[in-house]
């Protein structure tokens, strides 16, 4: 049976994606849903937020994804040191501009990280360092855009906290998937070369499996220790 490449709908396996049907990449949406599901299984609270990373007008990038990849490595290294468990999905797009831009969706341990503005500040810092331009330029030109404006210019919220123990947990999760689903759309106007990578995701599958293996290991160690203690007291 051939593997699905794209589909046209406004939902995916019961998860609402948009108001009207549009074309999505099956693999991209699958990854987005799995990211949110995996993180909400791993943490009781998950902070989800979207940002766009852009180049300043007139900047001569080399056309590769090197700037983006290096900046994301620095961001994730920074967040990992603070125990935020940073995971992300990202999409490269390029239309009429000389340079690409990147849509990024983050999912972090919400028990450790709760501030979206602080998340943006960290992204701005590492994006400015990678492009070797002043931080003030990144901030003034909104080169790390918080995705808080609707197409008509009105304000819209960016990001949310998914609280697994909340009565609204299911709704919070669905809204997060819906927001990130923008990264899974098919854009006919994208001029990115077919040989250039357009979709990115952190190793959340690998990290999750490692975390669960360690949890089982320590649970077994604790159970064995408890059993040994009980035997010794008889």
Name the predicted role of every residue range.
Residues 33-94:
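Signature for HUH/AEP ssDNA processing cores
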Residues 88-112:
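Histidine-centered divalent-metal-coordination microenvironment in nucleic-acid enzymes
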Residues 4-22, 60-76, 104-106:
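Charged, low-complexity, helix/coiled-coil-prone segments
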Residues 1-43, 110, 115-234:
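Catalytic "initiation/cleavage/transfer" segments centered on a nucleophilic residue
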């Amino acid at each position: 049976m051939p593997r699905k490449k794209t589909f046209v709908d406004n939902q995916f396996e019961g998860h609402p994606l948009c108001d009207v049907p549009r074309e999505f990449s099956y693999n991209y949406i699958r990854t987005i849903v799995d990211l949110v599901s995996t993180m909400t299984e791993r943490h009781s609270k998950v902070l989800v937020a979207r940002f766009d990373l852009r180049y300043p007008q007139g900047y001569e990038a080399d056309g590769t994804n090197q700037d983006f990849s290096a900046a994301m490595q620095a961001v994730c290294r920074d967040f990992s040191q603070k125990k935020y468990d940073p995971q992300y999905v990202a999409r490269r797009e390029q239309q009429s501009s000389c340079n690409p831009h990147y849509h990024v969706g983050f999912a972090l341990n919400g028990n450790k990280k709760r501030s979206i503005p602080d998340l943006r500040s960290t992204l701005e810092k590492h994006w400015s360092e990678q492009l070797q331009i002043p931080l003030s330029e990144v901030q003034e030109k909104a080169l790390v855009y918080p995705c808080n404006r609707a197409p008509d210019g009105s304000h819209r919220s960016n990001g949310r906290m998914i609280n697994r123990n909340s009565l609204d947990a299911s709704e919070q999760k669905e809204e997060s998937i819906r927001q990130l689903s923008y990264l899974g759309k098919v854009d006919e106007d994208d001029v990115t070369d077919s040989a250039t990578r357009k979709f990115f995701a952190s190793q959340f599958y690998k990290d999750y499996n490692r975390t669960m293996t360690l949890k089982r290991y320590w649970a077994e160690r604790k159970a064995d220790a408890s059993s040994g203690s009980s035997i010794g007291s008889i």
